[in-house]
């Protein structure tokens, strides 16, 4: 629980573990915390696991369209979505400039069609020849071509926190998009899940 509270207290994704001599002997990641939580799912409070997404106290909320002729962004304080016709580089720029780990890609009706994440950034940064593609391809083309694209990235308001945990674990992702009537209405992050758990 100390590690969870430390990760939640700031914008941390990893916590170093040091020995008595002050040397780093291990690094705990958010993904590892999700794995441990999932492995102990049978020991979690069933009341917590049955909480529905709509009843969470900590969820990023509904989108409002922001006028931006270049990107056709949809944004509120916690969620930014990019239209599939925007160039892929714009999604990458948003991830970097807003310090989020992923942005959903949506069609003109705000229906989610995929996601660009920091996982894509790491892959592109290790292959310089791919950078040019980001300026040529649209977001829609990029996510269709990418072998890093995760398909199961959404939940409904009636899904339970057990389902949320299972999807985080199965897909090794840190964010799920809440969908209602085929459009994004919010997001749940790993940090939201841990905050809910610690406050129960």
Spans of features found by a protein language model:
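Helix-loop-beta junctions that constitute the ligand-sensing/allosteric loops
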Residues: 1-20, 24, 76-80, 86-108, ...
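Tandem CBS (Bateman) regulatory domains
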Residues: 30-80, 92-93, 117-169, 190-200
């Amino acid at each position: 629980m100390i590690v969870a509270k430390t990760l939640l207290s700031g914008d941390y994704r990893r916590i170093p573990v040091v020995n008595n001599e002050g040397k780093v002997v291990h690094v705990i990641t958010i993904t590892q915390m999700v794995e441990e939580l999932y492995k102990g799912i049978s020991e979690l409070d069933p009341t917590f696991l049955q909480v529905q997404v709509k009843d969470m106290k900590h969820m990023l909320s509904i989108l409002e369209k922001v006028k931006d002729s270049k990107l056709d962004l949809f944004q509120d304080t916690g969620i930014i979505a990019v239209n599939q016709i925007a160039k892929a580089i714009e999604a990458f720029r948003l991830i970097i400039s807003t310090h989020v780990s992923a942005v959903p890609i949506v069609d003109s009706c705000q229906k989610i069609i995929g996601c660009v994440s920091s996982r894509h950034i790491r892959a592109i940064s290790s292959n310089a020849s791919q950078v040019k593609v980001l300026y040529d391809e649209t977001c829609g083309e990029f996510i269709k071509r990418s072998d890093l694209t995760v398909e199961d990235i959404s939940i409904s308001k009636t899904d339970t926190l057990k389902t949320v945990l299972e999807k985080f674990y199965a897909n090794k992702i840190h964010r799920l998009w809440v969908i209602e009537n085929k459009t994004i209405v919010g997001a749940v992050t790993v940090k939201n899940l841990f905050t809910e758990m610690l406050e129960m």
